[in-house]
């Protein structure tokens, strides 16, 4: 095959090459002369020279330092000895707890102690010999446990977020469970299986209110906590009114009740509190509307009574005015 290579050099450049005998590199300057008869002599800018004399690397610049990355033997031995120390510390603590640390040792105990020392020595040798293997296993285990903890934390965070999203349903479920538990307790008290005193039975509503406060602080955001607290205070106020009415009824008709007074009071207060709570959760603000409605009804009744008294007063005033009219004026009015 013919070489179709065409030189891009101008005739002037070719004449300069013939005069100098070689090309001139503008960056490196003129090439020094070398003896081609010497063995292995190569021009300093040739490709073979670059390959045979590579540039200095970071490793060569720091050739004075060590290149062995493996841990020294003493460090391996110390790290391998650490788990054995921890294991023996647990054994010593257990013997101290049982008050049997080097006390009343016989032949069997000393034989067991020697066997334990032999096992610890063999374990130390094995851990030192397989240092890289078990350290890698420990690293992998630690990374795996860290990932498990991370996944668990993310899962719990999602669960908490879900609780905030369904806080009303969760609170109703928790409250119904508490209702069932308290009903079981009341039944056990009635059957005589449990001996609760009067304070515990009467404090059932207080326990329910505390549970409501705890659940509210956990499941309700802080900006709606005030509404929950106000609702709880309203429920407790209604509790007090009902308690007064129940105590008054028991004082009047105490002989007709088969149960003791504090049992009736506990039942009434407990079921009333649960009914009001569920009603408030299903329709937020119902207690406030109930209070406003009650106030309006009372105001309407009082206004009606006031109007009735005013009309009666006006009627009496009109009658008095008619009685005070003179007889002459009455005759004039009659003629007109």
From Swiss-Prot:
Query: Where does the record place the region Disordered?
Result: 1-21, 35-68
Name it. Answer: Meiotic drive suppressor wtf23
One cellular component term from this protein's GO annotations in UniProt: cytoplasm
Query: Which Pfam families does this entry report, sorted A to Z?
Result: WTF
Native species of this protein? Schizosaccharomyces kambucha (Fission yeast)
**Compartment(s) where it occurs, according to its Swiss-Prot or TrEMBL record:** Spore membrane; Vacuole membrane
Q: How does it sit in the membrane?
A: Multi-pass membrane protein
The residues that cross the membrane are 73-93, 110-130, 140-160, 169-189, 206-226, 228-248, 261-281
Superkingdom, taxonomy of origin: Eukaryota
Describe its partners and assembly state.
Homomer. Interacts with other proteins that exhibit high sequence similarity.
Annotated family: Belongs to the WTF family.
Q: Which InterPro entries match?
A: WTF (IPR004982)
GO process annotations (BP): meiotic drive
What keywords are annotated for this sequence in UniProt? Membrane, Transmembrane, Transmembrane helix, Vacuole
| Function noted in UniProt | Acts as a suppressor component of the dual wtf meiotic drive system, and can suppress but not confer meiotic drive by compatible poisons. Wtf meiotic drive systems promote unequal transmission of alleles from the parental zygote to progeny spores by encoding a poison and an antidote from the same locus; the poison is trans-acting and forms toxic aggregates in all spores within an ascus, wherease the antidote is spore-specific and targets aggregates for degradation by the vacuole.
């Amino acid at each position: 095959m013919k070489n179709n290579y065409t030189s891009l050099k101008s005739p002037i450049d070719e004449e300069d090459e013939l005069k100098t005998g070689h090309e001139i590199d503008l960056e490196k300057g003129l090439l020094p002369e070398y003896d081609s008869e010497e063995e292995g002599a190569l021009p300093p800018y040739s490709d073979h020279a670059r390959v045979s004399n590579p540039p200095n690397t970071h490793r060569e610049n720091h050739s004075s330092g060590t290149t062995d990355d493996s841990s020294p033997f003493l460090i391996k031995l110390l790290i391998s000895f650490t788990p054995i120390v921890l294991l023996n510390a647990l054994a010593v603590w257990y013997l101290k707890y049982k008050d049997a640390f080097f006390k009343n040792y016989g032949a069997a105990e000393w034989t067991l102690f020697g066997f334990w020392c032999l096992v610890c020595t063999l374990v130390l040798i094995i851990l030192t010999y397989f240092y890289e293997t078990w350290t890698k296993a420990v690293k992998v285990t630690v990374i795996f446990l860290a990932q498990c903890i991370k996944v668990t934390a993310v899962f719990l965070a999602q669960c908490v977020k879900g609780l905030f999203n369904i806080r009303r349903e969760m609170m109703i479920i928790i409250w119904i469970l508490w209702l069932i538990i308290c009903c079981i307790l009341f039944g056990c008290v009635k059957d005589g299986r449990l001996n609760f005193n009067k304070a515990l039975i009467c404090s059932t509503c207080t326990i329910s209110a505390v549970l409501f406060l705890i659940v509210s602080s956990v499941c309700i955001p802080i900006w709606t906590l005030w509404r929950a607290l106000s609702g709880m205070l309203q429920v407790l106020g209604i509790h007090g009114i009902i308690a007064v009415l129940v105590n008054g009824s028991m004082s009047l008709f105490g002989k007709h009740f088969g149960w003791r007074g504090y049992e009736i009071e506990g039942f009434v207060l407990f079921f009333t509190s649960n009914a009001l709570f569920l009603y408030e959760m299903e329709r937020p603000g119902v207690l406030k509307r109930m209070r406003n409605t009650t106030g309006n009804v009372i105001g309407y009744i009082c206004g009606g009574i006031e109007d009735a008294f005013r009309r009666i007063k006006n009627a009496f005033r009109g009658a008095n005015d008619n009685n005070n009219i003179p007889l002459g004026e009455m005759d004039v009015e009659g003629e007109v």
